[in-house]
């Protein structure tokens, strides 16, 4: 039996607002997860407006022990700390990812760089990196205009699975609305069926 969902972190990254299909599908998925888990809290994070890129100061601060950081270093990591706290507090992530030129939006990549922190969301071992954000579920809603998901040109799916696993989130379900420009009506209907199936499993 699935564990009840208590807090959902919904992450949007599309540059589009009202017309964004990834936003609409992610919202539908979130609403159905809430319906299956009454009382679940939702925290929304829209990264489309852009986040700071990682800088030399950020890197230096992140590798400095917390009790040895200067005030400037603490300020350099303040946003990263806040974003990581949101992820740590959630048991479920819903990530809306439109494909831009075969990959994820630059704003989403900037967000991911902010939350991938050594000794915070992953640690190095002799056997390789180990993720520290365990016991979480992620749903990745991907939308492409004309590129088939899991094709050689799809650099979204493998990347999202890899980076989520890197920080410890290995239970990942993809909701795919690929080639939406080819047949929008049928592709949307199929994505909604995927959402229904995923939320049915979550409620089981």
From Swiss-Prot:
FMN binds at residues 14, 20-22, 99-102. The keyword Lipid biosynthesis does not apply. Signal peptide: none annotated. The keyword NAD applies. It holds the Pfam family Flavodoxin_2. Its EC number is 1.6.5.-, 1.7.1.17. Coiled coil: none annotated. Its cofactor is FMN. GO terms for molecular function: electron transfer activity; FMN binding; oxidoreductase activity, acting on NAD(P)H as acceptor; oxidoreductase activity, acting on NAD(P)H, quinone or similar compound as acceptor. Binds 1 FMN per subunit. It catalyses: 2 a quinone + NADH + H(+) = 2 a 1,4-benzosemiquinone + NAD(+); N,N-dimethyl-1,4-phenylenediamine + anthranilate + 2 NAD(+) = 2-(4-dimethylaminophenyl)diazenylbenzoate + 2 NADH + 2 H(+). Keywords: Flavoprotein, FMN, NAD, Oxidoreductase. PANTHER family: FMN-DEPENDENT NADH-AZOREDUCTASE 1 (PTHR43741), FMN-DEPENDENT NADH:QUINONE OXIDOREDUCTASE (PTHR43741:SF2). Belongs to the azoreductase type 1 family. Homodimer. Quinone reductase that provides resistance to thiol-specific stress caused by electrophilic quinones. HAMAP family: Azoreductase_type1 (MF_01216). This is FMN-dependent NADH:quinone oxidoreductase 1. The gene is azoR1.
């Amino acid at each position: 039996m699935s564990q009840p969902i208590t807090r959902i972190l919904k992450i949007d990254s599309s540059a589009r607002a009202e017309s964004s299909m990834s936003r609409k599908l992610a919202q539908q998925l979130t609403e159905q997860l809430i319906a299956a888990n009454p009382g679940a809290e939702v925290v929304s994070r829209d990264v489309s407006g852009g986040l700071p890129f990682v800088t030399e100061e950020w890197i230096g601060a992140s590798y400095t022990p917390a009790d040895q950081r200067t005030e400037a270093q603490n300020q350099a990591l303040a946003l990263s700390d806040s974003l990581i706290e949101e992820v740590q507090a959630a048991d479920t992530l819903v990530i809306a990812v439109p494909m831009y030129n075969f990959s994820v939006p630059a704003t989403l990549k900037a967000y991911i760089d902010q939350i991938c922190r050594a000794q915070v969301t992953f640690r190095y071992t002799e056997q390789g990196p180990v993720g520290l954000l365990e016991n979480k579920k992620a749903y990745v809603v991907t939308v492409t205009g004309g590129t088939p998901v899991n094709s050689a040109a799809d650099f979204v799916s493998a990347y999202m699975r890899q980076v989520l696993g890197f920080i410890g989130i290995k239970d990942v379900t993809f909701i795919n609305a690929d080639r939406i420009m080819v047949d929008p009506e049928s592709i949307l209907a199929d994505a909604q069926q995927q959402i229904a199936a995923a939320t049915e499993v979550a409620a089981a």
